[in-house]
Structure formats: structure tokens, C-alpha cells
Amino acid sequence: MELTPREKDKMLIFTAGLVAERRRERGLKLNYPEAVAYISAAVLEKAREGMSVAELMHHGTTLLTRDEVMEGVPEMISDIQVEATFPDGTKLVTVHHPIT
């Protein structure tokens, strides 16, 4: 299977997001890379489902709470930017202060 660099990046985000999702479901607190992957993967999936950029910017802030991540992680993540594929093309989605 031949994949472009962009497709490889999306596969890596999806895989890391899946690992983070499983750890979260088991009650483990997510570290920095897991939290970023979890939110990024969720944004990519919702974009494919047709959610707008504005909706995704808000949705990204509802995915994780301080109680679900390790100490200090919320302060480390001020913004997450994901290049997502929408029905009308690719757009950059920025989620500001994603962990409440």
C-alpha cells in the first residue's frame, strides 16, 4: 500500500488517538502526546462527518477535562492545530485551550 506523507501523518494521529482513547477508557490519565493525539483524532473524524470549522473549534474543547490528564498537561497545550479534510477541501482547525 502506497501512502503519501499526509496520509501517513493522518494514520499516525489516528493510531495514537486510538491508544489514548483506550487508555482513557481504562481510567488512565493521559500524558501530553496522548492528549494531543486524542483531540486531534477526534477533530479529524468529526471533520469527515461534516462538522464545520467553528463547530470543531468548540467541540475540541469538550473532549478532555483536567481530571482526565496528568498534572501540568492542560498548561502545556494552549492550542492544537489540525489540517482536516472537509467535503469542500482541506482546512486548518485551531482548538484554543482544549483542556478545561
UniProtKB/Swiss-Prot annotation:
Its EC number is 3.5.1.5. Its main location: cytoplasm. Pfam families: Urease_gamma (PF00547). CDD domains: Urease_gamma (cd00390). GO terms for biological process: urea catabolic process. Keywords: Cytoplasm, Hydrolase. GO terms for cellular component: cytoplasm. Pathway: Nitrogen metabolism; urea degradation; CO(2) and NH(3) from urea (urease route): step 1/1. It is an enzyme of class 3 (hydrolase). The keyword Transmembrane helix does not apply. It is found in: Cytoplasm. Belongs to the urease gamma subunit family. NCBIfam families: PRK13241.1 (NF009712), urease_gam (TIGR00193). Heterotrimer of UreA (gamma), UreB (beta) and UreC (alpha) subunits. Three heterotrimers associate to form the active enzyme. This is Urease subunit gamma. It comes from Nitrosococcus oceani (strain ATCC 19707 / BCRC 17464 / JCM 30415 / NCIMB 11848 / C-107).
